[in-house]
Amino acid sequence: MLQSNRLTIYAIGKIKKHWIRDGINQYKKRMPELIINESKTFNLDNLRSNNNIIICLSEEGKQFNSVELCSLLLNFKNKKINFLIGDTDGVSSDIKEKSDLVLSLSPLTFPHELARLILIEQIYRAISISNNSPYHRS
């Protein structure tokens, strides 16, 4: 079973659009253990400690459907999973190279703030799939 207490989202910058913040807060109420860390930079050395998994979001990344994403996250067993979301310029090629996985949410391009909301919804969906809850309909 996938649990939100093993998942952290690291994002560059703060959410400025209130409607995106409201959407994120709705999912945070459902997953209060999920950590969202807003900062100015990523410290990969700290994120890499204890053999944590680093998943970087980028439009050039690998795409999964929701069930595949759930399976991927479940395969990481008891490891802590850190998602990295860049700012308007994305993330550097150095961070992409050092990540365990570069993930794309869609072939479409999204503003970085909206990508956070979409990622959080997909995390909630993956947890729901792993718990056999009715949220996800195949």
Curated annotation (Swiss-Prot):
CDD domains associated with the record: RlmH-like
Binding of S-adenosyl-L-methionine, residues: L57, G86, L105, S106, P107, L108, T109, F110
GO annotations of cellular component type: cytoplasm
Pfam families documented for this protein: SPOUT_MTase
Chief location category: cytoplasm
Protein location: Cytoplasm
Keywords: Cytoplasm, Methyltransferase, rRNA processing, S-adenosyl-L-methionine, Transferase
Lineage top rank: taxon: Bacteria
Keyword Transmembrane appears in the UniProt entry: no
InterPro entries according to UniProt: Alpha/beta_knot_MTases, RlmH-like, tRNA_m1G_MTases_N
TM annotation in the entry: none
An annotated Gene Ontology molecular function: rRNA (pseudouridine-N3-)-methyltransferase activity
EC number: 2.1.1.177
Reactions listed under catalytic activity: pseudouridine(1915) in 23S rRNA + S-adenosyl-L-methionine = N(3)-methylpseudouridine(1915) in 23S rRNA + S-adenosyl-L-homocysteine + H(+)
Quaternary data: Homodimer.
Biological role: Specifically methylates the pseudouridine at position 1915 (m3Psi1915) in 23S rRNA.
Family: Belongs to the RNA methyltransferase RlmH family.
The protein's name in its UniProt record: Ribosomal RNA large subunit methyltransferase H
Taxonomic lineage: Bacteria, Bacillati, Cyanobacteriota, Cyanophyceae, Synechococcales
Gene: rlmH
